[in-house]
């Protein structure tokens, strides 16, 4: 049987971020809704045509979005929180996404283990969904005019939608409300002549999946009554223990991710129904490297022996990679030739299918093999780095003294010491200086003088506010990963390699392609400038190895653990240079530590083992007198607290203001012994917290954690705030800390416990 091809979604925002510009123009009032929608429709059409020209047989439709595809489905299903029901159309859609005066936005969180963020639907107890699929069906009709029978509508599964939502009701009861709406939609698609519908159900690959059997079986039984073939799509991992019953669901086909987990082993063990289509996700939709055709073809031929009706496809939507590697003319040719962005992945899918179908693709395969050989010559292993890793000993991952003995050797501060997380407002003037320097319009000396002036101003303001521990402000940094990656060998940078993070926000992840080497100090100059303006301690500021790795496109030729340890060695040398320059405190931030957790809990220990090891390697060489800080901006610590403690950071600052002290309580209940920076106010809000509000937050915190363990800080960096918001907020924070400190000295100097 002839193998076909399919896509599950395509790159977003446009090659030149056209949708980002249109959205921000619309939000600012410079662009009308008609112009915004025209831009969106044009980009959506371009995506279809690109896939059509690549020869894809089944092309995803409905995956593109103005803001977020989960928000789209909540809107189409009529799952509108009551606070937004007075609005309609784009006003309501963007209010749900971004909030407006008196109307808080939906919560935003990570889409599984990717770096994309989705908006969390809110399903109120008495919700009575009132669907409107007009927009979705219009997209399908437009696609049919271009793609014909290749049109493959993408529908987010009701089970996945509910599992990702905030809801208080019973899953089965909520599902019974939604399933008739889904069935009606499928019947409308059938009437349009759609040959097959993709139902995306990624929740099945998570640890939750095994407990959802009853709900999933009920869903697909009811959806089957619509009379249109359903193709169940999973991605991001293997199905694990759910595999044997998922493949028995009443569906026409099932798509599986063969690039993560152990999917091929599951097929070998349990087989696959001969009468179903197997969507083989063999082209990795989340990395940027070309496949090795001979290896993938061997797997595809084995699969074809089990499932004759086979489709070759990316492992997931291509929204997680940039549009076109051919645009990156500035990259060295050997590197560029082995990169595969969305357009190149379409070509890879088509090539693999042609080869599987017996066409002569030997010349193309030989060319790819030659490109990889050229790349290997361009980026050979670095013997010094490999030897340094081989020479690592257990003591390299440990501080010289345990925490209790380090504590007395470190800088002594008043009770409830105050500090910030690191960044301060980046004004238009600062961004202009960086842009001019990048374009070569100002010299390095002129640029550094401008940055130094900002650092001096920042130090002066912090001293006037009365903070105990200062930071230099990070004015030279555009991004906490890109800044360091640009100073390390082994990372490459794109000009057009943007991917959507959320809404109009795009990120341009560095590409980790070779062994990591630090040619020279990365942060010492700015630290010295800052420290020269004050007698108070200034923290050195670094991004941790796991965050550097998780927010980049990693290599595929060596394990992630090895890549993290290489980065850690570079950071270890930076910590030593900061100490030599006079730093007595160094902060190594790891906001992405938790984000990298595998989707299956049984795989957490392996990941956390090397992730913690990487942090300990980066910081283990620090002198006992050097206080190591780390910051983690998420609110769920309970299930990984033992690993947080194993980091052995002297001070852990947390995001606590929006969690009702839940984070602090988790830490206290676990018996965490190290110092904790209580994030006492929400930097994501422009509102200036009052002294009384911060006092309340601190008093609540001290009911769980003793004063000698407590630091006081905002819950995250201040980069996106304005000075007129930052200064009064920090003044109130310092005033609250001083007031409470004086009260404690008078009454209970040893602190309070619950």
Swiss-Prot record:
Function comment: Catalyzes the transfer of a methyl group from 5-methyltetrahydrofolate to homocysteine resulting in methionine formation.
Reaction equation(s) it catalyzes: 5-methyltetrahydropteroyltri-L-glutamate + L-homocysteine = tetrahydropteroyltri-L-glutamate + L-methionine
One biological process term in Gene Ontology: methionine biosynthetic process
Transmembrane segments: none
The organism's taxonomic lineage, starting at the top: Bacteria, Bacillati, Cyanobacteriota, Cyanophyceae, Synechococcales
Record CDD domains: CIMS_C_terminal_like, CIMS_N_terminal_like
Species, as recorded: Synechococcus sp. (strain JA-2-3B'a(2-13)) (Cyanobacteria bacterium Yellowstone B-Prime)
Gene transcribed to yield this protein: metE
Record's protein name: 5-methyltetrahydropteroyltriglutamate--homocysteine methyltransferase
Residues at which Zn(2+) binds: 631, 633, 655, 716
UniProt-annotated binding residues for L-methionine: 421-423, 474, 589
Keywords tagged on the record: Amino-acid biosynthesis, Metal-binding, Methionine biosynthesis, Methyltransferase, Repeat, Transferase, Zinc
